C-alpha cells in the first residue's frame, strides 16, 4: 500500500512538474484596441489621438516660464457652427497649496465657462483644422513643486439658423 501511495505521489509530482515547466514557456500579450469613427456631420478630434492623456509643461530655468501646449484638431459640422467652453471654467495648475492659471484658446478664441463660437458655419461645414493652445501664467519664484491640472473642453454642434 505504501508503495502504491509513493508511486502515486511521484506520478502526480512528475505531472505537475511538467505542467509548471510548460507554464514557464508561455508568452502572453494583452492587446487593447479602440476605434473612434466620427460622424460625417459633426466631429472635433485632435490629430494626435494621444493628446490630453499625459501632457507636460516643462519649466525653463532661464526665463522662469513653463512651455505651452499646442495641438491641431480636425473640426467639422455640416449642420452649422461649433461652440466650445471649459467645463467648470478655466483651469489652473495646482500643487495642493498654490495655483498657476492656465489660458486655453481654440482657434484663437480664449475659452471660459461660457459657450462661445470657435468655428463659424461657413468654415466648419466643409471641415477645417484649428489649433488648441494652453499657456500657463509665469510662476512666482515661490511656486515650486509638482503641479497638475485636469480640465474638460466641451465642443457643441450649433445648428444652422435659416432666416
Which residue ranges define each predicted feature?
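Cleavable N-terminal signal peptides
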Residues: 10-11, 21
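N-terminal small/polar-rich segments of proteins
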Residues: 22-94, 125-163
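An anionic, turn-rich surface loop/hairpin at beta-sheet edges
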Residues: 113-127
